[in-house]
């Protein structure tokens, strides 16, 4: 039983080591690649965590499949039942957290669509009457395509060129389906606490991705930087910053985003940065795959141990 617990402990501790590596990797990559790396790492690490707990939870059931009496297994491994129950409790907590968070996403999305019922439509743009300066990408819902939602207060706060940047930014969110990446990372954070910081970092890189696409659309990085800054200053902070399907122009560290836009266009890493990026990619991928391999190895080890006990007649 000691080896089984060691395998599970290693699988559960891996995200604490892999998450910082994923965050460092994201800083070396352009926004698009950084967003994909963070999302993929979060999902893989969360999956490894769930797989390890499932493997630990069904140890007594494997004994039953091998036609071993549970009393004999408990006599051999006294901790098997309480440890399995603890794993089951952890899985139940994860299931509740995932359900509540997913339901929260759906409720927020439905509520946002409800608030646009009286909006003026112009193609993919919905203009909502209101003094508050608001702008966000509204994903599709129940067969309705995604829309860019902007308040009249936000439109009045920006000049024509700045409005073009704002609309290009929000359209980039819709076109890239960034809400799916954000939701995947948010749900992964509900599985393992070490992944919560990845979701926060992902918010920044998704906004940087949209910022760069907006700058390319207007072909003027300084205008894009000015527009992002003015829109963020005019708008109110999002109620649930980065924790749902609505991505807003004032999400994330705006000063850092503006400084990035005032600098050169992001490029793929070269030289030492490229070597560091490759090393970090390998480390994060290895950690995620190791978590899955540990979960599979746990299953195989339990089956082997059960067969050995049966063959030697110890249970």
Segments and roles (model prediction):
Residues 2-4, 11, 80-105, 233-315:
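Cytosolic-facing loops and C-terminal tails of multi-pass membrane proteins
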Residues 29-33, 66-70, 110-114, 302-311:
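Juxtamembrane extracytosolic/periplasmic "stalk" immediately C-terminal to the first targeting helix
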């Amino acid at each position: 039983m000691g080896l089984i617990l060691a395998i599970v402990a290693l699988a559960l501790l891996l995200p604490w080591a892999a998450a910082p590596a994923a965050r460092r990797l994201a800083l070396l990559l352009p926004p698009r690649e950084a967003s994909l790396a963070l999302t993929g790492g979060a999902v893989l690490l969360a999956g490894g965590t769930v797989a390890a707990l499932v493997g630990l939870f069904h140890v007594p059931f494997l004994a039953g499949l091998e036609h071993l009496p549970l009393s004999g297994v408990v006599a051999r491994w006294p901790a098997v039942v309480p440890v399995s129950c603890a794993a089951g409790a952890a899985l139940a907590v994860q299931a509740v957290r995932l359900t509540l968070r997913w339901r929260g996403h759906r409720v927020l999305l439905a509520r946002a669509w409800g608030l646009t019922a009286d909006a003026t439509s112009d193609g993919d743009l919905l203009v909502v009457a209101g003094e508050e300066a608001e702008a966000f990408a509204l994903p599709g819902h129940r067969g309705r395509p995604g829309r860019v939602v902007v308040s009249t207060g936000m439109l009045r706060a920006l000049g024509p060129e700045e409005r073009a940047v704002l609309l290009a930014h929000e359209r980039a969110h819709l076109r890239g389906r960034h809400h799916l990446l954000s939701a995947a990372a948010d749900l992964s954070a509900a599985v393992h606490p070490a992944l919560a910081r990845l979701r926060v970092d992902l918010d920044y890189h998704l906004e940087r991705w949209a910022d760069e696409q907006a700058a390319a659309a207007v072909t003027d990085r300084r205008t894009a930087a000015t527009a992002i800054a003015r829109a963020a200053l005019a708008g109110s902070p999002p109620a649930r910053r980065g924790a749902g399907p609505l991505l807003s122009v004032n999400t994330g560290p705006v000063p850092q985003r503006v400084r990035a836009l005032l600098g050169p266009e992001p490029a793929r890493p070269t030289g030492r940065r490229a070597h560091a990026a490759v090393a970090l990619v390998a480390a994060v991928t290895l950690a995620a795959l190791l978590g899955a391999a540990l979960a599979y190895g746990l299953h195989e080890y339990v089956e082997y141990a059960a067969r050995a006990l049966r063959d030697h007649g110890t249970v």
